[in-house]
Regions:
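Domain-level signature for soluble enzymes in the chorismate/prephenate branch of the shikimate pathway
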Residues: 1-357
């Protein structure tokens, strides 16, 4: 009886799938035409502001029952596949594969890209600066561990610009080759992951040795080769390295997130929900920082982040990294930045880009 009820529903799904197949290929054909026009004008293949607008429209017009984030993931992969018909972009990231950095690449670009895993954040910057990759994805801050200082230092020095950002929830899982903790003698992970799971590990596996390694991807590789080792990593690593998850979501902070920035030579246009990152320094005098930031309040520009870093001059000078709402070309933001520049001892716009939800 149940088969009699399921048969017409399955036939309906098959018919809808056939329509989807036709529509997806029609979309791809139009995307190819877009690619031809871009090639004539030497326009960039990847336009983060355009893709951000598409994803925002998907969420706004979604009638359900599918969740908007799930639909956005589907549309991101559709755009990625269509973009690859124009040109498959190369994206450098902090490797190896199976890390949260690779997951951030997929969240920004989809999976239809050429990946370039790098051994360090410095190498990611060098790869993009040399033209080996069009874009790079690097971590800039974690909600529990704080700022990635090396990324800030390199953003100050580079000629590249920030063209996007990714806010990635960090969900750590404990995984092994066998799917069991039987016979496990050590738990491997990046030092930050071990710190972020410390309370959980103390409660559940207080006597097992913990070993810090270069990355969670490296930990997963170790667990693949050594049956006596477990790894802490993301779900992607388990899939990449053929491991089984023993315990999921073991991080102490359920709201743990890492923010990544996309670096490249592309300067995105405004999409309507933008953020601008700047770095500046001030003369060493009383009230200098307060006076410097006054133009933001004057022009009604909201500051969302303020971070200081030593300037390494030996004179107790500091660089201030500031994120503000809006695009650098927005009239009010443009006026505020112009005033900031006249007052600052050093001033640099790191980039304007679509703000990640």
């Amino acid at each position: 009886m149940s088969d009699d009820k399921l048969k017409p529903l399955r036939e309906q799904i098959d018919a809808l799938d056939a329509q989807l197949l036709i529509l997806l290929n029609e979309r791809a054909k139009v995307a190819q035409q877009v690619g031809h026009v871009k090639a004539e004008t030497n326009a960039p293949v990847f336009r983060p502001e355009r893709e951000a607008q598409v994803l925002a429209r998907v969420a706004k017009n979604n009638p359900g029952p599918l969740h908007s984030t799930d639909l956005q993931s589907i549309f991101r992969e559709v755009m990625s596949a269509c973009r690859a018909l124009e040109n498959r972009v190369t994206v450098a990231f902090l490797g190896p594969v199976g890390t949260y950095s690779e997951q951030a690449v997929w969240q920004q670009f989809g999976q239809a890209v050429t990946e370039l895993p790098c051994i360090s954040i410095d190498e990611v910057f060098r790869s993009v600066e040399a033209g080996t990759a069009e874009f790079g994805v690097v971590p800039v801050e974690n909600s529990t561990e704080g700022t990635i200082n090396r990324t800030l230092d390199l953003l100050l020095q580079t000629t590249l610009t920030i063209s996007g950002e990714v806010a990635l929830p960090v969900h750590h899982s404990l995984m092994t080759r066998t799917g069991s903790m039987q016979g496990i003698k050590r738990i491997c992970a990046h030092s930050q992951a071990l710190a972020q799971c410390q309370s959980w590990l103390n409660e559940h596996y207080p006597t097992i040795e913990r070993q810090a390694v270069a990355s969670n991807g490296e930990a997963a590789k170790i667990a693949t080769d050594d049956h006596s080792a477990a790894a802490i990593a993301g779900e992607m690593a388990a899939k990449r390295y053929g491991l089984s998850i023993v315990h999921a979501h073991i991080q102490d902070d359920p709201h743990n997130r890492t923010r990544f920035v996309v670096i490249g030579r592309l300067i995105p246009s405004a999409c309507g929900k933008d953020q601008t990152s700047i770095v500046l320094s001030v003369p060493n005098k009383p009230g200098a920082v307060y006076e410097l930031l006054a133009p933001l309040a004057k022009h009604g520009v909201s500051m969302t982040r303020f971070e200081s870093r030593p300037a390494r001059t030996g004179r107790w000078d500091y660089y201030f990294y500031v994120d503000i709402q809006g695009h650098a070309n927005d009239p009010t933001v443009s006026k505020a930045l112009a005033e900031l520049q006249t007052q600052a001892a050093f001033f640099k716009v790191l980039g304007s880009y679509p703000h990640a939800s």
